[in-house]
Design a protein with these regions (language model features):
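Short, intrinsically disordered low-complexity segments enriched in Ser/Thr with adjacent Pro
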Residues: 2-7, 16-18
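Conserved protein kinase catalytic core
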Residues: 62-64, 189, 225
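Acidic, Mg2+-coordinating catalytic module of metal-dependent nucleases/exonucleases
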Residues: 149-156, 160-161, 165-166, 196-250
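Histidine/lysine/aspartate-rich catalytic loop segments that bind and position anionic ligands
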Residues: 166-168, 175-190
Length: 250
């Protein structure tokens, strides 16, 4: 009888992200199969050729150069047939700490991750980046864009850890812009008067489960919903729609 990872977790009594895996749509090797109708090439006009991709990381501390990257997740975005920006696909990986990485006990207590748990099924940084970047690059191409731009809640933090991992692995095909980002802290502060994700998400009328918070996949998906909600409300207020008339590139 074959025992699934989920059954192993249940039998071991392990709980939470420290032992588990991302949901079934995440954490598997990317096959390259993507629906050609999922992404709208008009998205390329919306952000001057950049595809927003929401990223969240969970880490062993605050210093991207010295502290471990433990989880990374990404959510691609697309334009639907009504011109609204919506989440498209989600991807995530558990990551093995790089050699010599710092693991701050306070950070691990905060995010609930046990980096040594045998059922994490974590990958090396390079393998995790490869698995995550492949579908991001495919989404960029399908959307008619030239590059991905990272969206995050405190985006400088997530981009810092992504860039540090890319540098450690000498990774040559990073799909993300090296320094430009969209930050939902700023956007939600402006639109909702809230800068904390756990407060901004409910304020925007989006469900929030504190028991799943501080997992990279969950936080990335909720950040994606928040980003889309703010942008779509801005559109409904009568803001210009650049995907219809891109105008001059200045």
């Amino acid at each position: 009888m074959t025992t699934s990872p989920e059954q192993l977790i249940a039998m071991s009594g392990a709980k939470g992200r420290s032992a588990g895996r991302f949901p079934s749509r995440c954490g598997f090797p990317y096959s390259g199969a993507m629906s050609s109708s999922l992404y709208n090439p008009l998205m390329a006009n919306r952000f001057r050729g950049y595809l927003p991709v929401v990223v969240d990381v969970e880490t062993g501390g605050f210093n991207a150069a010295t502290d471990a990257l433990l989880e990374i997740a990404a959510v691609t975005l697309r334009l639907d047939t009504d011109g609204r920006i919506v989440p498209a696909e989600s991807f995530g990986e558990h990551v093995l700490p790089f050699e010599g990485a710092n693991l701050d006990p306070k950070a691990l207590a905060f995010n609930g991750i046990d980096p040594t748990h045998p059922l994490r099924m974590a990958k090396t940084e390079k393998d995790a980046l490869t698995s995550l970047f492949a579908p991001v690059r495919a989404a960029v191409k399908e959307s008619g864009c030239k590059r991905a731009i990272l969206v995050g809640h405190n985006a400088f933090f997530d981009l810092g850890f992504v860039n540090a991992a890319v540098a450690r692995c000498n990774y040559k095909r990073n799909p993300f812009h090296p320094f430009s980002t969209f930050d939902t802290v700023t956007l939600s502060g402006m639109a909702l008067g809230q800068t904390v994700l756990a407060r901004a998400v409910p304020m925007a009328g989006i469900d929030w489960d504190p028991n799943q918070a501080h997992g990279a996949l969950y936080d990335a998906e909720k950040t994606a919903e928040l980003f889309c909600r703010i942008l779509n409300q801005w559109r409904e207020l009568g803001a210009p729609q650049p995907w219809q008339d891109p105008g001059p590139d200045v």
